[in-house]
């Protein structure tokens, strides 16, 4: 997940209301993204799942 280093034309712009980019990974396999997309509030990470969030609405 890249927040501020956008690589055109592959970046994603999140819609209003869900304007944070996020990526979810399993802590056991941190290099394998499970899910990524847009969300309104960054979820808290748990023992098994780690969330990375951008504070912008554009990300790669």
UniProtKB/Swiss-Prot annotation:
Similarity comment: family membership: Belongs to the three-finger toxin family. Short-chain subfamily. Type IA cytotoxin sub-subfamily.
Q: Give the subcellular location.
A: Secreted; Target cell membrane
Q: Which GO terms describe its molecular function?
A: toxin activity
Subunit structure comment from the entry:
Monomer in solution; Homodimer and oligomer in the presence of negatively charged lipids forming a pore with a size ranging between 20 and 30 Angstroms.
Q: Which InterPro entries match?
A: Cytotoxin_Cobra, Snake_3FTx, Snake_toxin-like_sf, Snake_toxin_con_site, Toxin_cobra-type
Entry function:
Shows cytolytic activity on many different cells by forming pore in lipid membranes. In vivo, increases heart rate or kills the animal by cardiac arrest. In addition, it binds to heparin with high affinity, interacts with Kv channel-interacting protein 1 (KCNIP1) in a calcium-independent manner, and binds to integrin alpha-V/beta-3 (ITGAV/ITGB3) with moderate affinity.
Name of the featured protein: Cytotoxin 1
Q: Which organism does this sequence originate in?
A: Naja mossambica
Listed GO cellular component terms? extracellular region; membrane; other organism cell membrane
């Amino acid at each position: 997940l890249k927040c501020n280093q956008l690589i055109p034309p592959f970046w994603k712009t999140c819609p209003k209301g869900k304007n944070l980019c996020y990526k979810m990974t399993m802590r056991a396999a941190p290099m394998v993204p499970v899910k990524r997309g847009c969300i309104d509030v960054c979820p808290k990470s748990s023992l098994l799942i780690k969330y990375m969030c951008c504070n912008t609405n554009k990300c790669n």
